[in-house]
Protein backbone atom coordinates (compact mmCIF):
# COMPACT_ATOMS: atom_id res chain seq x y z
CA UNK A 1 0.00 0.00 0.00
CA UNK A 2 1.40 3.39 -0.92
CA UNK A 3 2.24 5.71 1.99
CA UNK A 4 0.02 8.71 2.67
CA UNK A 5 2.96 11.11 2.85
CA UNK A 6 3.06 13.13 -0.38
CA UNK A 7 6.04 12.87 -2.66
CA UNK A 8 6.73 16.56 -2.93
CA UNK A 9 10.11 17.66 -1.69
CA UNK A 10 9.78 21.09 -3.20
CA UNK A 11 7.20 23.55 -4.43
CA UNK A 12 5.66 22.66 -7.80
CA UNK A 13 6.72 24.75 -10.74
CA UNK A 14 4.21 27.13 -12.37
CA UNK A 15 4.02 24.84 -15.43
CA UNK A 16 3.29 21.84 -13.22
CA UNK A 17 0.61 23.80 -11.38
CA UNK A 18 -0.99 24.83 -14.63
CA UNK A 19 -0.86 21.24 -15.85
CA UNK A 20 -2.48 20.10 -12.64
CA UNK A 21 -5.34 22.53 -13.15
CA UNK A 22 -5.87 21.53 -16.80
CA UNK A 23 -5.60 17.83 -15.98
CA UNK A 24 -7.97 17.92 -13.05
CA UNK A 25 -11.60 17.27 -13.79
CA UNK A 26 -14.41 19.50 -12.63
CA UNK A 27 -15.57 16.87 -10.13
CA UNK A 28 -12.09 16.65 -8.63
CA UNK A 29 -11.79 20.42 -8.27
CA UNK A 30 -15.23 20.59 -6.69
CA UNK A 31 -14.23 17.85 -4.26
CA UNK A 32 -11.08 19.76 -3.34
CA UNK A 33 -13.06 22.96 -2.78
CA UNK A 34 -15.82 21.44 -0.63
CA UNK A 35 -13.64 19.05 1.39
CA UNK A 36 -12.92 21.55 4.22
CA UNK A 37 -16.63 22.31 4.58
CA UNK A 38 -17.64 18.64 4.63
CA UNK A 39 -14.93 17.82 7.16
CA UNK A 40 -16.01 20.75 9.35
CA UNK A 41 -19.55 19.35 9.54
CA UNK A 42 -18.09 15.89 10.26
CA UNK A 43 -15.78 17.21 12.97
CA UNK A 44 -18.63 19.13 14.58
CA UNK A 45 -20.81 16.02 14.72
CA UNK A 46 -17.97 13.91 16.13
CA UNK A 47 -17.37 16.51 18.86
CA UNK A 48 -20.74 18.00 19.78
CA UNK A 49 -22.74 14.80 20.13
CA UNK A 50 -20.14 12.89 22.23
CA UNK A 51 -19.78 16.10 24.27
CA UNK A 52 -23.46 15.87 25.17
CA UNK A 53 -23.11 12.14 25.82
CA UNK A 54 -20.45 12.90 28.43
CA UNK A 55 -22.91 15.22 30.20
CA UNK A 56 -25.50 12.43 30.19
CA UNK A 57 -23.08 9.77 31.44
CA UNK A 58 -21.81 12.06 34.20
CA UNK A 59 -25.38 12.72 35.35
CA UNK A 60 -26.07 8.98 35.28
CA UNK A 61 -22.95 8.23 37.35
CA UNK A 62 -24.10 10.78 39.91
CA UNK A 63 -27.43 9.01 40.22
CA UNK A 64 -29.62 11.03 37.87
CA UNK A 65 -31.47 9.71 34.86
CA UNK A 66 -31.29 11.72 31.64
CA UNK A 67 -32.36 11.74 28.02
CA UNK A 68 -29.60 12.21 25.45
CA UNK A 69 -30.41 13.93 22.17
CA UNK A 70 -28.20 14.78 19.21
CA UNK A 71 -27.26 18.27 20.46
CA UNK A 72 -28.46 18.48 24.04
CA UNK A 73 -29.15 16.42 27.13
CA UNK A 74 -32.08 16.66 29.53
CA UNK A 75 -30.97 15.38 32.96
CA UNK A 76 -33.44 14.81 35.79
CA UNK A 77 -31.30 16.88 38.12
CA UNK A 78 -33.90 18.84 40.09
CA UNK A 79 -32.62 17.27 43.33
CA UNK A 80 -28.93 17.73 42.48
CA UNK A 81 -26.62 19.72 44.73
CA UNK A 82 -24.64 22.67 43.32
CA UNK A 83 -21.49 20.52 43.25
CA UNK A 84 -23.27 17.82 41.28
CA UNK A 85 -24.63 20.40 38.84
CA UNK A 86 -21.14 21.82 38.39
CA UNK A 87 -19.74 18.34 37.72
CA UNK A 88 -22.39 17.66 35.09
CA UNK A 89 -21.84 21.06 33.45
CA UNK A 90 -18.03 20.92 33.24
CA UNK A 91 -17.76 17.27 32.17
CA UNK A 92 -18.50 18.08 28.53
CA UNK A 93 -16.03 20.99 28.19
CA UNK A 94 -13.28 18.97 29.88
CA UNK A 95 -13.90 16.13 27.43
CA UNK A 96 -13.79 18.53 24.46
CA UNK A 97 -10.61 20.20 25.70
CA UNK A 98 -8.85 16.83 26.04
CA UNK A 99 -10.03 15.79 22.57
CA UNK A 100 -8.82 19.10 21.16
CA UNK A 101 -5.37 18.79 22.70
CA UNK A 102 -4.96 15.21 21.48
CA UNK A 103 -6.22 16.06 17.99
CA UNK A 104 -3.94 19.07 17.61
CA UNK A 105 -0.94 17.15 18.94
CA UNK A 106 -1.58 14.33 16.45
CA UNK A 107 -2.01 16.88 13.67
CA UNK A 108 1.26 18.67 14.43
CA UNK A 109 3.38 15.60 15.11
CA UNK A 110 2.01 13.03 12.68
CA UNK A 111 -0.74 14.02 10.26
CA UNK A 112 0.01 17.56 9.06
CA UNK A 113 1.43 16.18 5.78
CA UNK A 114 -1.15 13.44 5.27
CA UNK A 115 -4.60 13.70 3.69
CA UNK A 116 -6.24 12.84 7.01
CA UNK A 117 -4.52 15.83 8.61
CA UNK A 118 -7.27 18.22 7.55
CA UNK A 119 -9.86 16.24 9.53
CA UNK A 120 -7.62 16.25 12.61
CA UNK A 121 -7.20 20.02 12.26
CA UNK A 122 -10.95 20.57 11.96
CA UNK A 123 -11.46 18.21 14.89
CA UNK A 124 -9.10 20.29 17.03
CA UNK A 125 -10.74 23.57 16.00
CA UNK A 126 -14.23 22.40 16.92
CA UNK A 127 -13.05 20.74 20.14
CA UNK A 128 -11.34 23.95 21.32
CA UNK A 129 -14.25 26.06 20.12
CA UNK A 130 -16.83 24.27 22.28
CA UNK A 131 -15.32 24.88 25.78
CA UNK A 132 -14.24 28.44 24.93
CA UNK A 133 -17.70 29.21 23.63
CA UNK A 134 -19.11 27.59 26.76
CA UNK A 135 -17.15 30.08 28.84
CA UNK A 136 -19.07 32.89 27.16
CA UNK A 137 -22.64 31.62 27.35
CA UNK A 138 -22.63 27.84 27.70
CA UNK A 139 -21.60 25.03 30.03
CA UNK A 140 -18.79 26.86 31.84
CA UNK A 141 -21.04 29.89 32.25
CA UNK A 142 -23.68 27.64 33.83
CA UNK A 143 -21.12 26.00 36.11
CA UNK A 144 -19.97 29.41 37.33
CA UNK A 145 -23.57 30.28 38.11
CA UNK A 146 -24.06 27.03 40.03
CA UNK A 147 -20.89 27.84 41.96
CA UNK A 148 -22.15 31.25 43.01
CA UNK A 149 -19.75 33.34 40.91
CA UNK A 150 -20.54 37.04 40.81
CA UNK A 151 -21.68 38.74 37.63
CA UNK A 152 -18.35 40.60 37.47
CA UNK A 153 -16.40 37.33 37.65
CA UNK A 154 -18.55 35.75 34.97
CA UNK A 155 -18.19 38.80 32.73
CA UNK A 156 -14.39 38.81 33.14
CA UNK A 157 -14.18 35.12 32.24
CA UNK A 158 -16.40 35.77 29.22
CA UNK A 159 -14.09 38.57 28.05
CA UNK A 160 -11.03 36.34 28.43
CA UNK A 161 -12.81 33.56 26.51
CA UNK A 162 -13.71 35.97 23.70
CA UNK A 163 -10.07 37.06 23.39
CA UNK A 164 -8.77 33.49 23.47
CA UNK A 165 -11.33 32.23 20.97
CA UNK A 166 -10.70 35.11 18.58
CA UNK A 167 -6.94 34.60 18.73
CA UNK A 168 -7.23 30.84 18.33
CA UNK A 169 -9.49 31.16 15.29
CA UNK A 170 -7.16 33.73 13.69
CA UNK A 171 -4.18 31.39 13.81
CA UNK A 172 -6.26 28.34 12.89
CA UNK A 173 -7.46 30.28 9.85
CA UNK A 174 -3.87 30.79 8.75
CA UNK A 175 -3.23 27.07 9.20
CA UNK A 176 -6.38 26.11 7.31
CA UNK A 177 -5.38 28.30 4.38
CA UNK A 178 -2.27 26.17 3.90
CA UNK A 179 -4.60 23.34 2.86
CA UNK A 180 -5.82 25.23 -0.20
CA UNK A 181 -4.39 24.05 -3.54
CA UNK A 182 -1.39 26.15 -4.62
CA UNK A 183 -3.13 26.99 -7.90
CA UNK A 184 -6.06 28.61 -6.05
CA UNK A 185 -6.09 32.39 -5.90
CA UNK A 186 -6.08 34.11 -2.51
CA UNK A 187 -9.85 34.64 -2.59
CA UNK A 188 -10.48 31.04 -3.65
CA UNK A 189 -8.22 29.74 -0.87
CA UNK A 190 -9.97 31.84 1.77
CA UNK A 191 -13.40 30.83 0.47
CA UNK A 192 -12.81 27.07 0.44
CA UNK A 193 -10.85 26.79 3.71
CA UNK A 194 -12.57 29.25 6.07
CA UNK A 195 -15.53 31.18 4.62
CA UNK A 196 -17.08 28.02 3.20
CA UNK A 197 -16.92 26.02 6.45
CA UNK A 198 -18.27 29.04 8.33
CA UNK A 199 -21.15 30.10 6.10
CA UNK A 200 -22.09 26.91 4.27
CA UNK A 201 -20.90 24.50 6.95
CA UNK A 202 -22.92 26.16 9.71
CA UNK A 203 -26.10 25.94 7.62
CA UNK A 204 -25.42 22.29 6.73
CA UNK A 205 -24.66 21.47 10.34
CA UNK A 206 -27.94 23.03 11.47
CA UNK A 207 -29.88 21.06 8.84
CA UNK A 208 -28.17 17.81 9.81
CA UNK A 209 -29.14 18.29 13.45
CA UNK A 210 -32.80 19.18 12.85
CA UNK A 211 -35.13 18.93 14.63
CA UNK A 212 -33.63 20.87 17.52
CA UNK A 213 -35.23 23.31 19.97
CA UNK A 214 -35.38 26.92 18.87
CA UNK A 215 -33.33 28.00 21.87
CA UNK A 216 -30.34 26.12 20.40
CA UNK A 217 -30.54 27.42 16.83
CA UNK A 218 -29.87 31.12 17.48
CA UNK A 219 -26.89 30.58 19.85
CA UNK A 220 -25.23 28.23 17.36
CA UNK A 221 -25.64 30.70 14.53
CA UNK A 222 -24.48 33.65 16.63
CA UNK A 223 -21.47 31.83 18.09
CA UNK A 224 -20.30 30.96 14.58
CA UNK A 225 -19.30 34.62 14.06
CA UNK A 226 -15.91 33.79 15.58
CA UNK A 227 -15.17 32.06 12.28
CA UNK A 228 -14.78 35.59 10.93
CA UNK A 229 -11.41 35.67 12.70
CA UNK A 230 -10.42 32.49 10.85
CA UNK A 231 -11.31 34.23 7.59
CA UNK A 232 -9.15 37.20 8.60
CA UNK A 233 -6.30 34.87 9.51
CA UNK A 234 -6.57 33.14 6.14
CA UNK A 235 -6.48 36.53 4.40
CA UNK A 236 -3.20 37.32 6.15
CA UNK A 237 -1.69 33.89 5.54
CA UNK A 238 1.52 33.97 3.50
CA UNK A 239 0.64 30.64 1.88
CA UNK A 240 4.24 29.44 2.04
CA UNK A 241 3.28 25.87 3.00
CA UNK A 242 0.80 24.60 0.37
CA UNK A 243 3.43 22.44 -1.33
CA UNK A 244 3.81 20.48 1.90
CA UNK A 245 0.11 19.65 2.15
CA UNK A 246 -1.38 16.68 0.29
CA UNK A 247 -4.16 18.28 -1.74
CA UNK A 248 -7.00 15.79 -2.19
CA UNK A 249 -10.59 15.67 -3.25
CA UNK A 250 -12.98 13.91 -0.88
CA UNK A 251 -11.48 10.50 -0.13
CA UNK A 252 -13.26 7.21 0.71
CA UNK A 253 -12.16 7.52 4.38
CA UNK A 254 -13.61 11.06 4.43
CA UNK A 255 -16.95 9.78 3.17
CA UNK A 256 -16.95 6.81 5.55
CA UNK A 257 -16.24 8.94 8.63
CA UNK A 258 -18.79 11.54 7.52
CA UNK A 259 -21.46 8.88 7.03
CA UNK A 260 -20.72 7.39 10.46
CA UNK A 261 -20.91 10.81 12.11
CA UNK A 262 -24.22 11.67 10.45
CA UNK A 263 -25.67 8.27 11.33
CA UNK A 264 -24.75 8.81 14.98
CA UNK A 265 -26.52 12.17 14.96
CA UNK A 266 -29.69 10.84 13.34
CA UNK A 267 -29.90 7.88 15.74
CA UNK A 268 -30.23 10.31 18.65
CA UNK A 269 -32.92 12.53 17.13
CA UNK A 270 -35.68 10.92 19.20
CA UNK A 271 -33.53 10.67 22.33
CA UNK A 272 -31.93 7.81 24.23
CA UNK A 273 -32.97 7.38 27.84
CA UNK A 274 -30.33 6.64 30.48
CA UNK A 275 -32.46 5.60 33.42
CA UNK A 276 -31.74 4.06 36.80
Task: Give, region by region, the residue ranges found by the protein language model.
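Hydrophobic transmembrane alpha-helices and their immediate loop junctions
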Residues: 2-276
Amino acid sequence: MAPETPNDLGAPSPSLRAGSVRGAGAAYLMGVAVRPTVLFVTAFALNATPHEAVHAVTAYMLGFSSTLYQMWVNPDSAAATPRQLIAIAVAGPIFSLIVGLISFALYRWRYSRRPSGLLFLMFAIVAFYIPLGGSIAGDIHLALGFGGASKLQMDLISVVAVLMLSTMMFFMGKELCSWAPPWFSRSQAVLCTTAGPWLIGTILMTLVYLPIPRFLIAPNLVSSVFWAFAVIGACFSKRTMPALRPIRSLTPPDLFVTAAALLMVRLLVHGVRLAH
